């Protein structure tokens, strides 16, 4: 009897097992892994639990058994992932996004949750200062030992309700590194619903004019970049400049632009139940188009090209790089812009990343697909800098 009791797993061992395996089971859940992935993880867990306290459970064997068990878990997760053409980290990331966005929230609470006081400081070799525009603020990030003749205007995403946060400050550093160590101006524009359309576009134009007129950067030395709602602002800014007969930027970089606020594109239907950011449950889908849950267009014509740049025409536009994920409802927003731009002979590239979600580039180098997307941005900007 005493011998049997000595072999019972110690409380600390059980605690450590749970500490290690709970994240594993969480990843399997958000991954929506096939059944055999769960089976291999459960087998691994049971084998370690069974071996603990056995005569052979001591010394170096503990390390060997533990590593072997974790390898079984990893292999099981790897082969049980739903899509073999998409990396395992990216599919886990997509599942985490789906879990987070499924939590109940409202627009104002969501916006406030992102508007946190920043403790971000520029990395070595960079400095940052804030400029007050008429109605908004502009953060200028610049190398302390550089003298680049280029600049980049960054317009952040967030459905027009979430303000500037540290992710975009990290984006700014990356953009500067990729575009000739340039100055990057990130606009902190006014937010809805307190400030309705076109306040955000007015702020974007003010930021553009500040770079061009106050800092004296020629238009053809400025790139405009934006993601999601920021991609909308970037494209709308270009349309307004072109229609006013003004010089256009050197190029545009748009990541998952929210460019069709009417939700009329095909992907707003066929990706309605698979998009982890804006999709809905299959039980709630009855063929209706699905998009960003927003009242931004209330009382407005959602097909106005300035409001929904997917409906604009892009004659005379400079080179454009569009990136989107294959499973996002906003995919067709980019496709509509791309098709129109190509019809007018614009040097426009659209890259659709398999299995990727909305603004997956926010993962920076953590996901293989995100790293590849940034490499593509780097190649595009390097061409413009020549």
Predicted ranges, named:
Residues 56-60:
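Amphipathic, cytosolic membrane-interfacial segments at TM-TM junctions
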Residues 4-52, 63-108, 114-386:
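Alpha/beta-hydrolase superfamily serine-hydrolase fold, recognizing
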């Amino acid at each position: 009897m005493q011998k049997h009791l000595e072999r019972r797993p110690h409380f600390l061992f059980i605690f450590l097992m749970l500490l290690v395996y709970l994240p594993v089971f969480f990843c399997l859940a958000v991954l929506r892994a096939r059944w055999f992935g769960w089976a291999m993880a459960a087998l691994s867990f049971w084998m370690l639990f069974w071996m603990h306290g056995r005569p052979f459970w001591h010394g170096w064997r503990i390390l060997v058994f533990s590593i072997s068990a974790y390898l079984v878990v990893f292999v099981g997760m790897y082969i049980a992932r739903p899509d073999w053409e998409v990396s395992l980290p990216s599919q886990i990331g997509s599942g985490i996004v789906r879990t987070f966005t499924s939590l109940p929230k409202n627009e104002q609470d969501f916006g406030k949750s992102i508007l946190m006081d920043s403790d971000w400081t520029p990395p070595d070799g960079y400095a940052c200062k804030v400029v007050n525009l008429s109605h908004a603020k502009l953060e200028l990030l610049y190398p302390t030992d550089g003298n680049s003749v280029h600049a980049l205007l960054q317009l952040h995403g967030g459905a027009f309700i979430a303000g500037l946060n540290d992710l975009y400050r990290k984006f700014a550093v990356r953009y500067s590194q990729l575009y000739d160590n340039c100055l990057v101006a990130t606009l902190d524009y006014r937010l809805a619903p307190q400030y309705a359309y076109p306040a955000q576009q007015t702020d974007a134009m003010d930021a553009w004019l500040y770079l061009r007129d106050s800092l004296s950067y020629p238009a053809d030395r400025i790139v405009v970049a934006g993601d999601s709602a920021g991609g909308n602002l970037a494209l709308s800014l270009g349309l307004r400049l072109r229609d006013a007969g003004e010089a256009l930027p050197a190029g545009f970089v748009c990541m998952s632009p929210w460019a069709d606020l009417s939700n009329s594109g095909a992907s707003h239907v066929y990706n309605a139940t698979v998009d982890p950011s804006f999709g809905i449950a299959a039980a709630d889908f009855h063929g209706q188009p699905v998009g960003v849950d927003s009242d931004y267009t209330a009382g407005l014509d959602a097909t106005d090209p300035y409001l929904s740049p997917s409906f604009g025409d892009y004659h005379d536009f400079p080179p454009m790089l569009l990136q989107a994920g294959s499973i996002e409802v906003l995919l067709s927003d980019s496709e509509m812009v791309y098709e129109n731009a190509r019809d007018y002979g614009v040097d426009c590239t659209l890259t659709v990343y398999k299995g990727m979600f909305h603004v997956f580039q926010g993962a920076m180098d953590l996901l293989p697909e995100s790293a590849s997307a940034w490499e593509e941005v780097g190649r595009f900007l390097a061409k413009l800098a020549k």
